[in-house]
């Protein structure tokens, strides 16, 4: 694509490789080697290139504006590693230093200057992983995600975050030890304030300087792929930092943000909202995400704050209705459809995940039926209900048992991912362990029960770092995790439990093979609120089945009976109360043979001891002939609604 064609398609919103044109690029012009700098500032009066190579003199290198509002200059003064900015004379005459929106590196905070950088061509060695990903996809594969804030998983003695070179040596072996299938990073793009956790971005094409060089992250991803671990990154296409030297009112007029003040300003987050209906902004954002997928071989993108992009009244502030008087943001809606359409056309095996908190449907529906086209939606309703239930005193749980069972009424309306994310362990919400009811023993018992329920419930999985071993305190973004907790035997056993649970998930196809239809689950009993016991069967494509029973109160139930559709000899393959995991049981239940007898819609029964505050999972060891094998005629098995 020549330069003029690149500009034309930029203006029509069809240039998705914009970073190859705008920004700083090494070139040869008339036999001279140097760099060409280009920046989009259509309403600026003047733009000058300044940097180390001009001793920061503001008027030494003027740039020339073309008909498309792009300013350009070639210079042989700039060298690899030099820091630079654009000195912009805005429409009103006010002058301001601005970042290069297309830079691939920035200097360390608190500086915001771009660094002249040509990304090296990496010779990737993850071809086998990519081939498998293309062949297998992810819908019928295990997806169990470890969510990480790269700046606080571990820190150096001086308090600085680990670089990706360090994370490669320590985090990847930890992922392997813990048997996760994927890692998801909170935003890695350049951001001026660490306390924003990366959710108020400045440089959309650049890796945050504190995390190391781009090639270090490439090597990290490659090493993950070598160990069969996928890499997902959070991305924020809805809003950006309000800082004057970044994207905000770049040329003195609304450039990246909406013209309408109410639509532009995000009061809740102190940010500015992208004008998602503007062609140039669409080119910018889609180019950004394709850049990250291409340069870093990412396996998934989690799109942050989708509700903010969909609803004009999402922010608790004055808002401007759409042309029909409603609150739906048509520009955001159509942008998200187009985003997923473009990404899926080129990268069908890259996951697109929506963090969307409303009750809107069709987030994962196809565009043809009015959907947005995401692969997965975070199930925030399930997460809120289930955490509220597990925090409650068991005496009262029978009155709120619908909090556990309600999800079965809507579980397949979207393709869901079940998140216990960073948002649930900050701002006074308590750590996952401290959310659990009771004394320390019962808190860990509840946590083992909860995590087993998450693994057995239909949907892909996500757990935030530190939660895997029951970290004592809330997450603090400016400190490393409380690794000293692992000196406590209860935390060490909790960590071992989570690693074994993750392996259990990977080993049993019925827990991930059919995640999006009732073919993958059969409810045995969702109405036993008096005992607060829930039971269901997870099913695979080739007849594999696991019987999952959850006792959600601290009362052991001897001679507990459930109905089953298949006669046979069953063995307990999972029990959250084993001593090795912090419980009190020395061994599993003995194998049990079903008995003929009417139990609800079933004519086979299984009787065993159900551990207090425990989860018990059974697998058929040998099928027996029976003339009375019955399948539950109500696969949802839930009569009660919220």
Curated annotation (Swiss-Prot):
GO terms for molecular function: 1,4-alpha-glucan branching enzyme activity; cation binding; hydrolase activity, hydrolyzing O-glycosyl compounds. Keywords: Carbohydrate metabolism, Glycogen biosynthesis, Glycogen metabolism, Glycosyltransferase, Transferase. It comes from the Bacteria. InterPro entries: A-amylase/branching_C, Branching_enzy, GlgB, GlgB_N_E_set_prok, Glyco_hydro_13_cat_dom, Glyco_hydro_13_N, Glyco_hydro_b, Glycoside_hydrolase_SF. The keyword Membrane does not apply. One of its GO terms (biological process) is glycogen biosynthetic process. It is an enzyme of class 2 (transferase). The active site is at 304 (nucleophile), 355 (proton donor). Transmembrane segments: none annotated. It catalyses: Transfers a segment of a (1->4)-alpha-D-glucan chain to a primary hydroxy group in a similar glucan chain. The keyword Glycosyltransferase applies. Pfam families: Alpha-amylase, Alpha-amylase_C, CBM_48. One of its GO terms (cellular component) is cytosol. Its EC number is 2.4.1.18. Monomer. PANTHER family: 1,4-ALPHA-GLUCAN-BRANCHING ENZYME. Catalyzes the formation of the alpha-1,6-glucosidic linkages in glycogen by scission of a 1,4-alpha-linked oligosaccharide from growing alpha-1,4-glucan chains and the subsequent attachment of the oligosaccharide to the alpha-1,6 position. Belongs to the glycosyl hydrolase 13 family. GlgB subfamily. This is 1,4-alpha-glucan branching enzyme GlgB. It comes from Streptococcus pneumoniae (strain ATCC BAA-255 / R6).
